[in-house]
């Protein structure tokens, strides 16, 4: 075999290796930019994982994992998962594939503060997770307290 076809094959593999993560990054940015927004009521707590560090674990008011979750909104504008969610692609409506909302990664020094803030919130304060959804793909945009991103809320209140 000549060296030219081997080089071409090697170049093709290199290009494919760049295209795969490039596509994943593009899909996430596309979902964040043009996806439909859904707010999920949550209550965080701060676990520690020696491999992942600190993060904010979330207790969603909804069940936290669905293969295909058909999303709707309640009267207050918060996301509810349709009782028709299943293991098959839905025929209509906005859906998220493999929806799992159980953690939100943030700066390690902020995670314990976020938990303390959550404990001190009054019943009038609102905490929610903002999720963008497009064609079955979802991306967590942020954790919010009273419509303020939690990172900004922490820096202004501590």
Predicted regions and their residues:
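A structural detector for beta-sheet-dominated domains
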Residues: 41-43, 72-74, 132-134, 141
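Alpha-helical transmembrane signal-anchor/signal-peptide segments
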Residues: 27-45
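N-terminal hydrophobic targeting signals that begin at the initiator methionine
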Residues: 1-3
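Extracytoplasmic
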Residues: 35-37, 66, 76, 124-126
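Extracytoplasmic/periplasmic terminal helices and flexible tails
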Residues: 79-158
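Hydrophobic membrane-insertion alpha-helices, especially the h-region
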Residues: 5-24
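Short extracytoplasmic
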Residues: 41-70
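Membrane-embedded segments
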Residues: 69-71, 78-80
